[in-house]
Amino acid sequence: MSDIIYIEGREILDSRGNPTVEVEVQLSDFSYGRACVPSGASTGEYEALEMRDGDKSRYMGKGVLKAVDQVNTVIAEELDGADALDQAEIDNMLINLDGTENKSKLGANAMLGVSMAVARAAADSLGLPLYRYLGGVHAMQMPVPMANIINGGRHSDNKIDFQEYMIMPVGAPSIREGIRMTAEVFHALKDILKKEGHVTAVGDEGGFAPNIENVQALDYIMKAIEKAGYKPGKDVVIALDCASSELFDAGDRKGYKFWKSEPSKILNADEMVDLFKDWISKYPIVSIEDPLDQNDWEGYAKMTKELGNQIQIVGDDFFVTNTKRLARGIEEGACNSILIKLNQIGTVTETIDAVRMAQKAGYTAVISHRSGETEDAFIADLAVALETGQIKTGSMSRSDRIAKYNQLMRIEDELGYNARYAGMATFANLIKK
């Protein structure tokens, strides 16, 4: 039997030293699952709500004992005896129990911890790896890493305004080789930065955080790709996460304020798009995430019309893994890709629904970590299960990021000759005929 007989939540720490929720689930056949919930630094306005204690005497108000209590009382009682093999029903029970649009009653962190742990317990009950349980027999595509090697924005204390400068090893034959290529570029970049007198300390997601200009970050990445022995645009391409909602100033001088590098500089949406056009013409940039503010539907539709057949335009804060917002984006032609973060929506089933909706509409989907991570590698299995072809899970440092890469290599080894690496083909459906 796969009935739930035991659920326990606890407070643990994430990679930034902030509290987060861990949940354990045991089934009547002694199967077991455990999951840890990630947390973001720059969060979208429309994300599901994390429940925090607000008690300034503990962890500066960031404790999660209230969320843990919800797991151990209300949720545990509701799910007692429920069939763990019916993930959709389990998640529906959680959604109904919460009863709010943004998961504010139970907390998305409490709900997600339970949802993920139940999925792991169910996979254990069937004797299946998590990716096979969630994805079925056809889950064999390995994702291309989107590795953050230079940090800016709210992820660092330097003067780079945009949050993430990433590389993607699209020319690799396998995930293992792609990870090797990424690591080699990462170490080449470190050598270059060190020789030019820059600090090589790393940010929240393991990338370097040198105190350089926005465009200089691209120049350094190009040099690092070449120093590692690869060809920019063929072997390795560049992706950006601008996190532009963090730059948007809705005050008297409405626009995008480059508050770290040039506080007096404010661009409107058209000028932001012109900046990206210039960069795309000079650098092998294939993907830009959150290039505009999360409420600028008109701007996103216009940018997608102009650039959507050249690059991947990814909605993160714009879509927040929410099918309602995604459906509107599809209808209005805004973006051509969605970033997928489990804790933005709060359950495994809703996450899967968002990916399937995107794929059906011809959008790509990128499975993503958060800046506050743990050793949990659930998203590695999820990326393979849903055959998204892309995963964004940090740089080649910090064990909380490396845990995901190591899990991907294990999965590829397990799949053997059946494993397929997405490579540049992951962008094929974006090219309009």
UniProtKB/Swiss-Prot annotation:
It catalyses: (2R)-2-phosphoglycerate = phosphoenolpyruvate + H2O. The active site is at 205 (proton donor), 341 (proton acceptor). It comes from Treponema denticola (strain ATCC 35405 / DSM 14222 / CIP 103919 / JCM 8153 / KCTC 15104). HAMAP family: Enolase. (2R)-2-phosphoglycerate binds at residues 163, 341, 370-371, 392. This is Enolase. It comes from the Bacteria. Its EC number is 4.2.1.11.
